[in-house]
Amino acid sequence: MALLPILEFPDPRLRTKAVRVGVAEVVSSSFQTLLDDMFETMYAAPGIGLAATQVNVHQRFMVVDVSEEKNAPMVFINPEIVTREGDQVFQEGCLSVPGIHADVTRALSIVVRFLDRHGDEQQLTAEGLLAVCIQHEMDHLDGKLFIDYLSPLKRDMVRRKLEKQRRRAS
């Protein structure tokens, strides 16, 4: 297994729309290794979700584990939200936008259809943190970041803060 480099805002590759993954590819050993590498990268970061787009792989899949013990890994391949209900405001952060947190309104409950890591079709009802995480990671697959939900003024403040962090780091 290997740690993968995570793209950071404002890298334009984060804006790339991901393409669907073929079922034959899902079961390949190289794809399974990539999933394992993504989990290792997510846990090391540390994070609770990681979309393929964030590691410069522009295919529609993501890994998630919102458990406290980090023992409930979930893979979502070609995810689609079937239904959304209610609203919740959650303070979100992102491995691609380090050090920034902001309130984002998302659906309280979702039903998502997807392929699991074995290529089998699944359907899951998610609420709370899991629902937020799935919606956040699915946004990445569409080239969207959580900061896109902010006002232009707040987004500009985020950009300046990140530039300042990078200058300090170099």
Swiss-Prot record:
Q: Which residues bind Fe cation?
A: 94, 136, 140
What are the protein's GO molecular function terms? metal ion binding; peptide deformylase activity
Q: Which cofactors are named for this entry?
A: Fe(2+)
Concerning CDD domains, the annotation shows:
Pep_deformylase
Which positions are catalytic residues?
A: 137
User: Which transformation does this protein catalyse, written as a reaction?
Assistant: N-terminal N-formyl-L-methionyl-[peptide] + H2O = N-terminal L-methionyl-[peptide] + formate
GO:BP terms for this protein? Answer: co-translational protein modification; translation
* Gene3D superfamilies in alphabetical order: Peptide deformylase (3.90.45.10)
Known EC number:
3.5.1.88
The protein's UniProt keywords, in alphabetical order, are:
Hydrolase, Iron, Metal-binding, Protein biosynthesis
The entry's free-text remark on the cofactor is:
Binds 1 Fe(2+) ion.
What is the annotated role of this protein in its UniProt record? Removes the formyl group from the N-terminal Met of newly synthesized proteins. Requires at least a dipeptide for an efficient rate of reaction. N-terminal L-methionine is a prerequisite for activity but the enzyme has broad specificity at other positions.
What HAMAP family does UniProt report for this protein, alphabetically? Pep_deformylase
Tell me its family. Belongs to the polypeptide deformylase family.
* Name of the featured protein: Peptide deformylase
- The species this protein belongs to is Xylella fastidiosa (strain M12)
Q: Which gene encodes it?
A: def
